[in-house]
Amino acid sequence: MSQVNMRDMLKAGVHFGHQTRYWNPKMGKYIFGARNKIHIINLEKTLPMFNDALSFVEKLAAGKNKILFVGTKRSAGKIVREEAARCGSPFVDHRWLGGMLTNYKTIRASIKRLRELETQSQDGTFAKLTKKEALMRSRDLEKLDRSLGGIKDMGGLPDALFVIDVDHERIAITEANKLGIPVIGVVDTNSSPEGVDYIIPGNDDAIRAIQLYMGAMADAVIRGRSNAGGATEEFVEEAPAAESAEG
């Protein structure tokens, strides 16, 4: 069973919320008090909620389900990318494109284009083109990879979303809600918990806190997969077959 403890959360600064004047009253029940006009999150509430979310993710991973990691703001992107890669999960770290879930058919066409360009860049096609055309395709490849590289092997809609900063990723949450995809989210004192199925009340800005959330989630995925007897790389290997089955 994947678990975090109080000490880890305190060390990472999970308890530091936002300035009191920016608070969202819907988060009131998770606030312990205030210090120097900063809300302090009640970690006695966060701890069981965080561990419930980890157990949920572990169970999903044990059933070979896909958890999409989402964190596009500057402080989160790099950590999201690294931890998703470590556990072989899909991720969005740059920008959420509207319709990434609700208009997946269009997204799938863009992923197909990304794969074609990747092949062309490796099989010598680019070298046979004019300098201008090769440059244009290289730029297209770079742009598509930045936006869709993290989900190109997803092979269909995810079974859950894990989101850092629910306000920043509100479009992703709305899309998941429309499709009935469960959402796990880190919710700070200035954010609304609406649309989040598994709320983790906590600091969504501090790099150490983000590292704790992402590391624990990646560990839960790895543990779930190993319990199911599946390899971490399974997601990457199975994806092309799943994608063709979708089409």
From Swiss-Prot:
Cellular component GO terms, alphabetical: cytosolic small ribosomal subunit
PANTHER family xref list: 30S RIBOSOMAL PROTEIN S2 PROKARYOTIC AND ORGANELLAR, SMALL RIBOSOMAL SUBUNIT PROTEIN US2M
Protein's UniProt name: Small ribosomal subunit protein uS2
Annotated SUPFAM superfamilies: Ribosomal protein S2 (SSF52313)
Family, as annotated: Belongs to the universal ribosomal protein uS2 family.
Domain of life: Bacteria
MF term (GO), any: structural constituent of ribosome
Record carries keyword Ribosomal protein: yes
Keywords: Ribonucleoprotein, Ribosomal protein
Source species: Ectopseudomonas mendocina (strain ymp)
HAMAP family hit by this protein: Ribosomal_uS2_B (MF_00291_B)
Biological process annotations from GO: translation
Lineage: Bacteria, Pseudomonadati, Pseudomonadota, Gammaproteobacteria, Pseudomonadales
CDD domains: RPS2
Gene3D superfamilies registered for this protein in UniProt: Glucose-6-phosphate isomerase like protein, domain 1, Helix hairpin bin
